[in-house]
């Protein structure tokens, strides 16, 4: 997934720049959930690492525990149970979680065994034996498909003093009947899980081994959740799945719903609610889906299309199922059907066997597409994957690092030029909350997923505001508010075509 928009995340220098600008999102590499403390015999504190799906899963965990009488707290010191919802997508993520467990070990010792620790999610599924053998401080180890059993597992671990484990993957579990606790206190944007698992088996990716096979959630439960969020005042939903655009559900009466049809139906729940999704696979990005972007004004004009690499031979080794030429044709089709569309991607430097010429192909593809955003990484070998079993991780670390830095440098240049081109244009911005630099300013996003800062004046969180872009940094647009609007009104009046800048 997008490195949570899939975060998972950004290249380190882009994070530093966005932090310097004061507009970097909450670092989803580690999210301390801001649950309000609730009554309960035992208090639970949850930390989440990784992608948007993990964030949503933590909301499911919170809901399950509340139903069983647990309280939720934002104060770790007040917690009887600390749960780490983990990510296994890269080695660095696992190192961070191990370091966090080491810190918690000393705290557990200080509390003389009164603190229970749990490891949830992808790392729990992948490393269950090592967690139990090497991290003997862990009381529960629970995989992504076993969260309904968490209250019972906590009870068993507490009663017996022995670690309780359930990491079984399920072909049916979608948690369709559970409403996640919305830890995001802004009340503006919410995640809605529509499917789980992945069937693609890319050679570098551990997700199919930690999340299991694809299982789509019933359409009716998705639409009900979105409708409930609209009633609660949310203005944006992001549909989530490991491979979200492979969504396909068949009702008991035989009626089949594709992802394009689902997005269209979600967009009709409330014309004043923006719709996004993450993360998609290029092979499943159809004309029907692109036409929904074009025809439905509240479906954001932003598509995440992870290419991973710019060379066809490397893409074949990655088992991505498309060629460089096919991918480029898709991006051209997206730009043709959806004028002004913003494209983002994932890029891996130094995959097994990558030559200098193949690396140059990635750079040249970037020049052709000119992404607005990118999530960029060095290749990190993951156990269990086909690449770990069959390919040699033969690109030296210093070469990987140098190639990654070249990718980052080029992407930063493209992002800067893209933002500079926005000066003088008017965008509809959804206000997410105060700017991190100043309470006198608001921060929000365009439907092309660009961050915008402007003086807050009399506007409120959750408003749609027409903003003229006056200036920019490499990561943020700076604007002047024109007026409050609605999505329906903006569809008639807003434009992303260049207009004269205010003198």
Curated annotation (Swiss-Prot):
CDD domains, per the entry: Radical_SAM
PROSITE patterns, per the entry: MTTASE_N, MTTASE_RADICAL, RADICAL_SAM, TRAM
Domain MTTase N-terminal residues, every copy: 42-159
Signal sequence range: none
SUPFAM superfamilies: Radical SAM enzymes
Key word 4Fe-4S present: yes
Record's catalysed reaction(s): N(6)-dimethylallyladenosine(37) in tRNA + (sulfur carrier)-SH + AH2 + 2 S-adenosyl-L-methionine = 2-methylsulfanyl-N(6)-dimethylallyladenosine(37) in tRNA + (sulfur carrier)-H + 5'-deoxyadenosine + L-methionine + A + S-adenosyl-L-homocysteine + 2 H(+)
Location of the Radical SAM core domain: 184-417
Cellular localisation: Cytoplasm
NCBIfam families: miaB-methiolase, MiaB/RimO family radical SAM methylthiotransferase
Quaternary structure, from the entry: Monomer.
HAMAP family xref list: tRNA_metthiotr_MiaB
Family: Belongs to the methylthiotransferase family. MiaB subfamily.
Physiological role: Catalyzes the methylthiolation of N6-(dimethylallyl)adenosine (i(6)A), leading to the formation of 2-methylthio-N6-(dimethylallyl)adenosine (ms(2)i(6)A) at position 37 in tRNAs that read codons beginning with uridine.
Protein name, entry field: tRNA-2-methylthio-N(6)-dimethylallyladenosine synthase
Organism classification: Bacteria, Pseudomonadati, Rhodothermota, Rhodothermia, Rhodothermales
């Amino acid at each position: 997934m997008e490195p949570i928009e899939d975060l998972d995340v950004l290249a380190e220098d882009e994070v530093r720049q966005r932090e310097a600008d004061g507009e970097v999102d909450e670092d989803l590499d580690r999210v301390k959930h801001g649950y309000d403390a609730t009554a309960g015999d035992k208090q639970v504190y949850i930390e989440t690492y990784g992608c948007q799906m993990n964030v949503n899963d933590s909301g499911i965990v919170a809901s399950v525990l509340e139903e069983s009488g647990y309280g939720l707290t934002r104060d770790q010191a007040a917690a009887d149970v600390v749960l780490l919802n983990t990510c296994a997508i890269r080695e660095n993520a696992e190192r961070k979680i191990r370091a966090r467990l080491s810190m918690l070990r000393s705290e557990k010792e200080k509390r003389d065994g009164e603190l229970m620790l749990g490891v949830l999610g992808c790392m729990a599924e992948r490393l269950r034996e090592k967690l139990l053998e090497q991290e003997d401080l862990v009381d529960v180890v629970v995989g992504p498909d076993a969260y309904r059993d968490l209250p019972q597992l906590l009870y068993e671990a507490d009663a017996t003093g022995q670690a309780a484990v359930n990491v079984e993957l399920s072909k049916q579990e979608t948690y369709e009947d559970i409403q996640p606790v919305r830890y995001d206190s802004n009340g503006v944007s919410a995640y809605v899980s529509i499917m789980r698992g992945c069937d693609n088996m890319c050679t570098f990716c551990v997700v199919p081994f930690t999340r299991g096979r694809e299982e789509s959630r019933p359409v009716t439960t998705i639409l009900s959740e979105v409708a409930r969020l609209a009633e609660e005042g949310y203005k944006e939903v992001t549909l989530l799945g490991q491979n979200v655009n492979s969504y396909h559900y068949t009702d008991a009466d035989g009626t089949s719903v594709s992802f394009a049809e689902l997005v269209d139906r979600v967009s009709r729940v409330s014309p004043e609610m923006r719709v996004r999704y993450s993360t998609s696979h290029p092979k499943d990005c159809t004309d029907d889906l692109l036409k929904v972007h074009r025809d439905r004004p509240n479906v954001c004009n932003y598509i995440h299309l992870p290419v991973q690499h710019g060379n066809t031979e490397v893409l074949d080794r990655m088992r991505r199922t498309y060629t460089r030429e096919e991918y480029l044709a898709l991006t051209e089709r997206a730009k043709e059907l959806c004028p002004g569309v913003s494209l983002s991607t994932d890029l891996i430097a130094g995959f097994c066997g990558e030559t200098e010429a193949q690396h140059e192909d990635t750079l040249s593809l970037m020049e052709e597409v000119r992404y607005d955003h990118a999530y960029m990484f060095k290749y990190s070998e993951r156990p269990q994957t086909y690449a770990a079993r069959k390919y040699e991780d033969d690109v030296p670390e210093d070469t990987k690092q140098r190639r990654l830095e070249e990718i980052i440098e080029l992407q930063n240049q493209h992002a800067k030029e893209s933002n500079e081109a926005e000066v003088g244009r008017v965008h509809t911005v959804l206000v997410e909350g105060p700017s991190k630099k100043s309470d006198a300013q608001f921060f929000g996003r365009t439907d092309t997923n660009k961050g915008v800062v402007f003086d807050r004046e009399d506007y409120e969180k959750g408003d749609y505001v027409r903003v003229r872009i006056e200036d920019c940094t490499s990561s943020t647009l700076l604007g002047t508010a024109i007026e409050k609007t609605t999505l329906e009104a903006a569809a008639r009046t807003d434009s992303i075509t260049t207009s004269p800048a205010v003198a």
